[in-house]
């Protein structure tokens, strides 16, 4: 369109502009109107807090981002969800704009909800995340497994650690380390007779334990010696549970200990002549 000599482009193409003076003389001019360029800044992106995003424009002659950058691609690290504006200029000097939004998601924070992050074999701990939704995983299922935030310690021979990770639906992660103490094993003679020998039990074939770490569930069957670690004193017939609790980790282990009654001795009266002899025979009662 033309108004008072000012030509305004309406759509792309060529237009002939004619001027006629008061004497009837005319002059013409062909005006070319270039279309606006198509400018894009890429699809909206979602990042985790503390991460960065790369924004890339469609190919233009000149670029002007709202950040002040003038390159085709820029890297941004917003702390909150932010929309970025872009002005692109083509070879004809025509400009157009575009926008792209970078959504920022919080990082999950993982903590112990119930229990402790240091576990004995078979124990559990419940974890929680500050972000809802998502999945849990363990770096080593042979050390600890996790389901719904509940971690279960597996059997290990030495103190071991596993990293438990929570991954949100936005693929943002938070983690915590759990420690699993080694499984203990009681070994030695697990039977005795009332009045008989007093066996000494071992932990993982190691005698360096303390007497206070041992206990018996039934003092009427057997007690533990107060001064000698692992020494069991049979008291009466029956079965008792012997427990060893590690002084450092507080992890317990148990074993059944059986005590049998002492054999009974019975005799009959037999008369012999003076200077005679008698053969005595002992027969076990059981």
Positions of predicted regions on the chain:
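Low-complexity "stalk/linker" and mucin-like segments enriched in Ser/Thr/Pro/Ala/Gly
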Residues: 1-4, 42, 64-72, 137-150, ...
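Append "Rare intracellular matches occur via the same short Y/T/C beta-strand/loop motifs
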Residues: 12-23, 62-63, 80-92, 133, ...
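Interdomain boundary/hinge segments at the C-termini of tandem beta-sandwich modules
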Residues: 31-35, 100-106, 176-182, 255-261
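Proline-enriched interdomain boundary motifs that mark the N-terminal boundary
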Residues: 36-44, 107-115, 182-190, 261-268
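A short beta-strand segment in extracellular, disulfide-stabilized domains
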Residues: 51-59, 122-131, 197-206, 276-284
């Amino acid at each position: 369109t033309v108004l008072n000599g000012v030509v305004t482009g309406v759509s792309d193409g060529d237009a002939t502009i004619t001027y006629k003076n008061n004497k009837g003389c005319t002059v013409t001019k062909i005006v070319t109107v270039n279309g606006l360029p198509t400018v894009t800044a890429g699809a909206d992106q979602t990042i985790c807090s503390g991460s960065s995003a790369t924004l890339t424009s469609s190919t233009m002659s000149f670029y002007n981002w709202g950040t002040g950058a003038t390159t085709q691609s820029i890297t941004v690290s917003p702390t909150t969800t932010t929309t970025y504006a872009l002005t692109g200029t083509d070879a004809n000097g025509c400009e157009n704009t575009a926008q792209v939004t970078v959504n920022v998601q919080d990082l999950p924070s993982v903590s112990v909800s119930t229990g402790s992050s240091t576990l004995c074999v078979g124990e559990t701990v419940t974890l929680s995340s500050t972000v809802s939704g998502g999945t849990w995983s363990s770096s080593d299922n042979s050390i600890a497994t996790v389901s719904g935030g509940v971690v279960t310690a597996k059997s290990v021979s030495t103190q071991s650690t596993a990293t438990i990770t929570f991954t949100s639906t936005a693929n943002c992660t938070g983690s915590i380390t759990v420690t699993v103490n080694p499984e203990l094993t009681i070994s030695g003679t697990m039977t005795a007779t009332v009045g008989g020998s007093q066996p000494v039990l071992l932990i993982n074939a190691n005698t360096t334990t303390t007497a206070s770490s041992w206990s018996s569930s039934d003092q009427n069957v057997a007690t533990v010696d107060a001064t000698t670690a692992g020494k069991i004193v049979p008291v009466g017939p029956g079965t008792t549970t012997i427990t060893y609790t590690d002084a450092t980790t507080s992890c317990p282990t148990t074993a059944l200990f059986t005590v049998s009654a002492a054999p009974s001795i019975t005799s009959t009266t037999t008369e012999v002549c003076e200077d005679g002899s008698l053969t005595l025979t002992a027969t076990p009662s059981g």
